[in-house]
């Protein structure tokens, strides 16, 4: 068993209580004791770290990242891992890389490049495309090791283009069959381990060529059907970037 003791830490524990000096003991990667400074025993410890008053905090959870491509090549997921982030959530803003027909790969790269200003050349060189469906994307991510925990959502942009083809990419209305199929794929994604679903309704989000993210112009009916699918599963986060135009935004009415 591996035992590590951090002594003389200026602890910020995340509960809202004031900082305090403390000793922290970990065993096999788990915190087992937080004690007053100077009181922790070090016998049997493989490592003793003197924090010397440095701040020590729990790992940060970054609920809004866009590592959807970077997970293909970067086990460190920088820069998050440089700044105390221990859990990152991706698949935000309606953009991502699954599900994906092979002929949509470059289009999805240019969509992400436009929305998030991530160099397309890096994504083209780095993504290995070992998937088509969203569950296969999760399998690809799960087959790799990272220095922090990650979770992802199924994004509206790739979902719409996967089901509807160019009609979906062009933000044309979905048919009843389209909506049903998108809802089925969201259910499938949640059952496979997706944290939820994301969409973007802001015209500020555009592809490299200036196209709006698929889903930007859809009405309530399409989003409600997806929300109903999530309700049938019984869990899942529904994340959206609001439209930023009308005040109050239409989405607030939908949430009632």
Predicted regions and their residues:
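Divalent-metal coordination cores built from histidine and acidic residues
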Residues: 73-196
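Flexible loop/turn segments at secondary-structure boundaries
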Residues: 13, 68, 95-99, 158-161, ...
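Di-metal (Zn2+ and/or Mg2+/Mn2+) metal-binding site signature of metallo-dependent hydrolases
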Residues: 55-79
